[in-house]
Regions:
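Bacterial Sec-dependent N-terminal signal peptides
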Residues: 1-23
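Short, flexible coil/linker elements and helix-boundary hinge sites characteristic
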Residues: 17, 22, 34, 50, ...
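Short alpha-helical hairpin
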Residues: 97-116, 128-129
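Extreme N-terminal leader/anchor segments
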Residues: 23-94
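Extended hydrophobic/Leu-rich segments
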Residues: 8-11, 43, 63, 175-178, ...
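General helical secondary-structure elements
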Residues: 2, 15, 60-62, 127, ...
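Intrinsically disordered, low-complexity regions enriched in Ser/Pro/Gly/Gln/His and often acidic
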Residues: 55-56, 79-81, 90, 108, ...
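Aromatic-lined, polymer-binding surfaces characteristic
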Residues: 121-240
Length: 242
């Protein structure tokens, strides 16, 4: 009986984790794009025909076929990785995330990632978790080694972060209120995950991550739509503050 119960619990956990990282086609992405842009003719036609799955595939093909892309933060023709970055990438596979040099060794955030884990009550530790400093090293490790495990895990963590860190509405007073234990849950989490500095870090770094992981089979059409919708969600608040 105990073995049966244990199996049921483990199965339930596995199903929950799988659901959190499951990729979904986000059809709203097509309303965010300029479908009249040269090269997107097929995407536009398929979308207008109501064939959004095929349109997403065509969109991914478009991005993969581009040859004039400039990535100022990384040379895609000569990707290099330091020993330290390789360690961050490998630790990241096990959900041991490099967040802050002042807190070493890095903390593990659990098999089912707890993005609200706060092992030391230092705001910097929780803020900087959401900068995903190990993501770009994982991309470099993928490009250099060709090992799909890095891309697969990155895609899993990227979607997991989206699902567990929603940008919920809150008023200015709630956002600026000093932590006194009254603000908890998703509202408290927004103050860490969606602070403008963290948002701007993710916006900049994800341009490189997009290019590093783009050739991967784990970078599916559905994932592409999730990525673009999430990136747009990041860009909107930043555009309001500049």
């Amino acid at each position: 009986m105990n073995k049966t119960l244990k199996y049921i619990v483990l199965l339930a956990i596995a199903c929950f984790v799988g659901k959190a990282s499951a990729q979904e086609l986000k059809s709203e992405v097509f309303s965010l794009l300029n479908l009249d842009y040269p090269g997107l003719e097929k995407v536009k036609a398929l979308h207008q025909e109501g064939k959004d799955e095929d349109a997403a595939k065509a969109l991914l093909d478009y991005y993969r076929a581009r040859t004039n892309v400039k990535t100022p933060d990384i040379n895609l023709n000569k990707v290099t990785i330091s020993k330290e970055e390789q360690q961050w990438a490998d630790d990241g596979l096990k959900h041991t995330f490099f967040v802050h040099k002042g807190y070493q060794p890095s903390y593990n955030y659990g098999e089912d990632i707890n993005w609200q884990y706060w092992p030391v009550k230092d705001n910097e530790l929780r803020w900087q978790l959401h900068r995903h400093k190990w993501f770009t090293p994982m991309g470099k490790a993928y490009r250099i080694s060709g090992d799909e495990k890095y891309a697969k895990e990155w895609a899993h963590q990227y979607i997991d972060w989206i699902k567990k860190n929603p940008l919920v509405k809150m008023d200015k007073k709630e956002y600026e209120l000093l932590s006194d234990g009254k603000i908890k849950g998703e509202i408290e989490n927004v103050r860490f995950a969606w602070r403008p500095l963290e948002v701007s870090n993710r916006l900049q770094d994800q341009t490189s991550q997009f290019q590093l992981f783009l050739p991967s089979p784990s970078f599916t059409p559905d994932f592409l739509t999730e990525f673009l919708v999430n990136y747009h969600k990041h860009a909107i608040p930043v555009s309001y503050t500049h």
